[in-house]
């Protein structure tokens, strides 16, 4: 009986644990994902591509703008969930061109000034969403 009750409580609580996190509206409603989902004491953020503004070249002025766009979108999702960059425990970085890795690092580091750097992986990816030059996906610890 005790194990059946425990199973029932876990089953009943599971939908509440998997509810999408509150977030600003940067992701259009027709896209098939949530900006972030809390589970197991963590907040899993969807990848952010940081759109390059029209008329900018991705590999000159546009790349830095894309990094800023992605990291600012991550910051907005964190803020809407009562968190900040210091709560990030892991980031995965996908770059369309691995020669942009030093430029990415230079633009990424200021977001963690005075904070612990999260664990991170980075790899080259052929064909990111919407032709983006990068995508950044993070996991944050909930408070």
Please give the residue ranges for each predicted region:
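N-terminal presequence-like segments and the immediate start of the first folded domain
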Residues: 2-90, 94-143
């Amino acid at each position: 009986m005790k194990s059946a009750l425990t199973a029932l409580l876990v089953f009943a609580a599971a939908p509440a644990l998997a509810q999408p996190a509150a977030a600003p509206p940067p992701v259009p409603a027709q896209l098939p994902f949530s900006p972030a989902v809390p589970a197991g004491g963590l907040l899993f953020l969807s990848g952010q591509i940081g759109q390059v503004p029209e008329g900018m070249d991705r590999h000159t002025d546009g790349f830095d703008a894309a990094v800023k766009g992605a990291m600012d979108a991550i910051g907005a999702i964190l803020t809407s969930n009562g968190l900040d960059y210091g709560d990030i425990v892991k980031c995965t970085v996908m770059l369309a061109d691995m020669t942009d890795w030093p430029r990415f690092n230079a633009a990424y580091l200021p977001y963690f000034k005075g904070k612990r750097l999260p664990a991170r992986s980075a790899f080259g990816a052929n064909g990111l969403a919407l032709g983006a030059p990068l995508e950044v996906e993070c996991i944050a610890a909930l408070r």
